[in-house]
């Protein structure tokens, strides 16, 4: 495998933004997002289905169908509309999902008669291009190789933690999932 660089940028809300690239990323950051309160995702027992389901009240505050020019996953070059990535360019970016149904707070949420338990896990978003319309199918092989190396680095780091049993990568894309990358 070829060499990659990983920049660790600590955001104003203490979440880490990782920038991967073939060249070292040294760009100064632009405007950051406002700090949001951490949500308290948890599992709730569904007695009619006889299974645990995830619940995250914080998801109701997530960005929902903004115009493409205000995509929260694109480079944050517009100071009037900060994004998750406060840089004007990058190769691959990785950051924690602010609206995840899982987190590592390990607290049980008491909501009366509803059975709950912690929804332990870690959810990251990997943005594999600073171009809104890019897809993996259209990426050159060296960019795909960088993406695979990024996945490998994330696997290695996450699986070294005692609270992570497995890692499941998947791609969310499209209007049906309330995502703006179509």
Where do the model's predicted regions map?
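HIT superfamily nucleotide-processing domains
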Residues: 1-180
